[in-house]
């Protein structure tokens, strides 16, 4: 989900081999075109590039074994809906792997208007526990935090590093599984489907 030019998708395509299939979903036509070119250049015919959003994945229910998303959820407006969609397309027993930006507390309103903060993935992120809670609420089990990384330490922007420190923004790796007995995502309660960053 949010495949961009395809780094993760191409690695997955090599891992699953020619008998496996990788669906690479991205919203941006330019990124999809780059991914198609990169897959062709790598000789990987098992990558299918899909147009769409994380909140409405154009795949059938219970159709994939695993979903990865790397640095994307922080940019998705309705994170709970995106997680419910991921749950829907996973087969029972399927795995979710997330690498994204998490916070210790919400970003102050004055920073949310700064394009640099959006570009650096700070202002769209939520608290780590909220990610974990959303994953559990849609039905995932074995939800766990794997590791943390100080992603912003190498930012070229002093202001970004300052804001990241202020809100303890960091990269986190999470994983979860769809229960073997699962059939559909738990409904997202009205009023909680869209996260309020106000």
Where would I find each of the regions flagged by the language model?
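Class I SAM-dependent methyltransferase SAM/SAH-binding core
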Residues: 3-56
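Helix-to-beta-strand junctions that scaffold the AdoMet/dcAdoMet cofactor pocket
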Residues: 16-17, 76-77, 90-92
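A short acidic, Gly/Pro-enriched loop at the edge of an enzyme's catalytic core
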Residues: 55-66
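A short SAM/SAH-binding and catalytic strip from SAM-dependent methyltransferases
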Residues: 65-78
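A short glycine-rich, Lys/Arg-flanked "PGG" loop and its adjoining helix->strand segment in the class I
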Residues: 80-95
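Short, glycine-/aromatic-enriched active-site segment of Class I SAM-dependent methyltransferases
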Residues: 102-122
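Short alpha-helix
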Residues: 124-139, 145
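C-terminal lobe and adjacent flexible extensions of AdoMet/dcAdoMet transferase-like proteins
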Residues: 138-198
